[in-house]
Amino acid sequence: MDKNTPSGISELITRLRHDRTLTDPEFAALIEYKDELPALTAAADEVRRSVYGDAVFLRGLIEFTNICKNDCYYCGIRCGNKKVERYRLSCEDILSCCDTGYALGYRTFVLQGGEDPYFSTDRLCRILDRIRSKYPDCMITLSVGERSKADYKAFFDAGAGRYLLRHETATDAHYAKLHQESMSLANRKSCLFALKEIGSQVGAGFMVGSPYQTTENLVADLRFLMELDPDMIGIGPFIHHADTPFAAFPDGTLFTTLRLLSILRLCFPHVLLPATTALGTIHPSGRELGLKAGANVVMPNLSPVKTRKLYALYDNKICMGDEAAECRACLERRVASAGYKIVTDVGNVRRT
């Protein structure tokens, strides 16, 4: 069988749906196939509906600090970017965001920030405990980068039942091209496995179309995710930021991101898979197309409008000026237009 013909590709899709894996060359052929693959999109949608129906889960995003000690070459809030106006939200600010979100039906809050030394383990745990005490029916997700296993356990015990930490790329040489020398893929992976060991729901993920990325790198990402078996996988296109070393690199494409969303859904039928803001940034209907390709989570922004423009990981980020209620109503319309419906429960992973 020639895997690069329409019939060969069709067979790969059928086999991937059944076996949840392919060989490395077969994955590469599927990723690189130049034509649209409606059969792949349809298979991914059928699989997501078989597990989650037409439900799309809301995650209220609270970007609580744009201060970061790291200097990742792709990121707009890297410590080396001296043009950024830095901010931190207080515990009361964060609780106010949660109040707004709860009234709008959000039952998961995602606290995301740079690796800001001010937010010590104790300080973060106090914030988590306040949220958990006020909203015991909600799930808290934390995303604050690489910490020790003891820190992760403390966060988990304080109420953060989920943790997001994108691995960004599963290839050492590629990782080294994207990050400062003091950072390592080995440590990033070790953090992810530590999170699993303590019982946290874990999210990993990667950029699509990042500088120097090859198809082989993407296949390695799929293999690593199979090893990790996360509860959530966040992928989105690389989008350049003007004040980074990667300002002149081309952005990742909608085409390849959607292709990978569908592949991920077939590999991981149970996974929680966001249609990211970055998708909506590179295409006006990016998030709707992401849902149709297999995604089942959206993450509207609950951060104060005055700080949103300061949390610019990449250029032209959407939804910078909308009040939380506007974001909620807009997303509800978008989700419905794609043929799904927003649900307001905590949206736990459904493993079979």
Label each PLM-derived region with a short phrase.
Residues 1-38, 102, 226-352:
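Auxiliary Fe-S-binding modules of radical SAM enzymes
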Residues 44, 72, 111, 165, ...:
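Conserved, mostly hydrophobic/aromatic
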Residues 52-93:
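Canonical Radical SAM [4Fe-4S] cluster-binding loop centered on the CxxxCxxC motif
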Residues 59-62, 82, 110-121, 173, ...:
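Glycine-rich, proline-tolerant flexible connector loops at the mouths of alpha/beta enzymes
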Residues 62-64, 115-117, 144-148, 169-171, ...:
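Active-site-proximal loop/turn and secondary-structure-junction residues that shape catalytic pockets
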Residues 79-95, 101-122, 128-192, 201-208, ...:
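Core AdoMet radical
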Residues 119-144, 184-201, 249-271, 323-335:
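Alpha-helix-loop-beta-strand connector modules within alpha/beta enzyme cores
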Residues 148-155, 211-225, 281-292:
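Catalytic cores of alpha/beta
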